[in-house]
């Protein structure tokens, strides 16, 4: 890990110089290195103090939320877990360690979606941001207003049982004999195939069909939310089923699901696993034409950029807006904070909870894939 023409002693002095703010620490660390009582990781030895543009740790604050197979979690919680399965820059689920990198100066990067949705990410000055339409990455310190950050979603196919689960959760009723009934009006006939696919018995009414679920037709607790650990396919199917029961696609345009606090919280935590990003919710009036609601109810809105035809089991998909990226609005100093970052082995990038693609930290410069470049580095 010595640089070209560098002696072992010179290498130890260079690495120890990372603690140059304290001569006592510098001397103690240099002595430790010289006597080989401790050796840092090879990438650190080759990069720290090297006369080339490198960035030892490019990290994010602990409150930054990322998408994992266990749902959305903060970087701090991911670090406590140690290894998580997250979504890389190719849209693949991969395992990655999440590491703490000490206390560093951080900055608030304010990101906006065409001025409608704004959020803040805390990052170090050297954090490498993936930029839309470019293979190059930009440091936090070099971000400008208007810099475009890619927006992504992984949209799996629906688990058929999950669609039925979501449909009954949203519009069905539990019976005293541990079964379920669901009345589907004729104007919602697009719902029929979801239930007919499982040969659910029904009777005709003057308004449509009344479906009855009992015995072998009950595969789960249909009036409960999917459990922790549900697959992306199950999450996708459930959300699409709830939309079919209690959702609407408006000309504003908006993709909306109506639900209670627990559904809202579940969608915020697990929706991103299937590419559904909640952007907000408005509380509905407690008083309705049918009386007073027994619990708080919300219109829950989703980011339209990742809504697909498969998500729209009813409504006119042509209302959906075209894809657009996140845009940097401002960068301001935040202060000293403990920072964290995953180490993604495939793309050195991963998805944040809102679908924004972020780079991860690295400790050596990017070099060309050739033996000459490797030897020169």
Please name every model-derived segment.
Residues 7, 69-78, 137-141, 231:
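Short, structural beta-strand-to-alpha-helix junction motif
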């Amino acid at each position: 890990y010595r640089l070209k023409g560098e002696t072992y002693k010179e290498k130890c002095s260079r690495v120890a110089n990372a603690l140059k703010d304290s001569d006592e620490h510098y001397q103690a660390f240099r002595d430790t290195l010289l006597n080989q009582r401790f050796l840092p990781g090879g990438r650190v030895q080759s990069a720290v103090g090297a006369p080339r543009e490198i960035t030892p740790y490019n990290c994010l604050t602990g409150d930054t939320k990322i998408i994992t197979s266990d749902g959305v979690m903060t970087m701090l919680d991911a670090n406590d877990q140690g290894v998580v399965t997250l979504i890389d820059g190719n849209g693949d689920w991969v395992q990655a360690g999440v590491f703490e990198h000490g206390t560093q100066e951080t900055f608030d990067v304010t990101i906006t979606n065409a001025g409608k949705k704004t959020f803040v990410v805390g990052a170090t000055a050297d954090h490498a941001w993936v930029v839309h339409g470019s293979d190059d990455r930009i440091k936090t310190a070099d971000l400008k207003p208007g810099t475009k950050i890619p927006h992504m979603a992984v949209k799996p196919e629906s688990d058929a049982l999950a669609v039925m689960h979501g449909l009954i959760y949203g519009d069905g009723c539990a019976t005293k004999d541990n079964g379920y009934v669901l009345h589907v009006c004729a104007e919602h006939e697009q719902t029929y195939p979801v239930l007919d696919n499982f040969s659910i018995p029904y009777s005709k009414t003057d308004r449509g069909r009344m479906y009855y679920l009992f015995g072998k037709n009950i595969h789960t607790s249909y009036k409960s939310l999917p459990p922790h650990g549900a697959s992306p396919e199950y999450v996708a199917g459930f959300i699409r089923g709830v939309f079919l029961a209690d959702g609407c696609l408006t000309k504003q345009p908006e993709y909306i699901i109506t639900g209670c606090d627990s559904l809202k919280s579940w969608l915020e935590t697990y929706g991103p696993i299937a590419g559904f990003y909640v952007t907000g919710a408005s509380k509905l009036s407690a008083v309705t034409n049918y009386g007073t609601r027994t619990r708080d109810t919300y219109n829950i809105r989703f980011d339209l950029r990742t809504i697909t035809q498969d998500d729209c089991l009813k409504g006119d998909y042509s209302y959906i807006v075209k894809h657009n990226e996140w845009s940097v609005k401002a960068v301001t100093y935040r202060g000293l904070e403990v920072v964290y970052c995953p180490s993604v082995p495939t793309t050195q990038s991963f998805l944040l909870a809102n679908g924004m693609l972020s780079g991860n930290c690295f400790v050596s410069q990017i070099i060309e894939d050739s033996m000459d470049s490797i030897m020169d580095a």
